[in-house]
């Protein structure tokens, strides 16, 4: 077993090591800042699957996210499901934010209001820089499927959306590909040409570092 001092030294070295966030699904910062934040904001992405597995119904999920309902009512409805999922990796990530970013020991009856207020307070321009660059020491983020959205900070890179060229099984997808390439599709040859134009556009973009299917 490593000594306490060795553990501390290793943790300090890890904290000071710049990292690459190799898989992100972050929206552009501007629209994110327009969205009201509260305790449930931390659980709306990957944790949703765990909540459903813990027994949350469609009605529960809708109520958790319904800002027209009193915050306390939403918390009381959410609380038993948090108890069921809190040891899972996704919930632990959310609770790390509560502890290390927001400064609360845990998300509880006595802190859900404060956590909600603090999440809203920090939801201001520069949020990504403060959390990703300054707090997490991230040198680059690789964003999935958001190539034509933005703007993003200059340390964001992109995985191009592979379905644009491989998932063209219906008319809507064909029309979308045609519009993006400004090239009509009336034959298989036209489709292949649009696929090639799309891939060439990705290859020419220095912010594109790969393709995600």
Regions found by a protein language model. Name each.
Residues 2-213:
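Metal-cofactor-binding active-site regions of metalloenzymes
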């Amino acid at each position: 077993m490593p000594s306490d001092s060795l553990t501390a030294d290793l943790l300090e070295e890890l904290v000071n090591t710049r990292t690459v966030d190799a898989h992100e699904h972050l929206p552009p910062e501007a629209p994110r800042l327009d969205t009201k934040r509260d305790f449930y904001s931390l659980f709306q992405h990957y944790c949703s699957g765990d909540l459903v597995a813990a027994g949350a119904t469609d009605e529960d999920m809708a109520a958790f996210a319904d800002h027209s309902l009193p915050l306390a009512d939403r918390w009381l409805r959410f609380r038993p499901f948090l108890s069921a999922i809190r040891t899972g990796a996704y919930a632990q990530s959310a609770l790390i934010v509560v502890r290390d970013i927001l400064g609360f020991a845990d998300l509880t009856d006595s802190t859900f209001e404060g956590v909600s207020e603090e999440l809203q307070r920090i939801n201001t321009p520069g949020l990504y820089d403060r959390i990703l660059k300054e707090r997490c020491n991230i040198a680059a983020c690789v964003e999935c499927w958001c190539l034509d959205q933005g703007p993003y900070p200059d340390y964001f890179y992109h995985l191009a959306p592979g379905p644009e060229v491989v998932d063209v099984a219906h008319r809507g997808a064909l029309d979308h590909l045609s519009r993006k390439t400004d090239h009509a599709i009336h034959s298989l040859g036209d489709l292949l040409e649009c696929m090639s134009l799309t891939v060439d556009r990705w290859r020419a973009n220095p912010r594109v570092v790969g393709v995600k299917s």
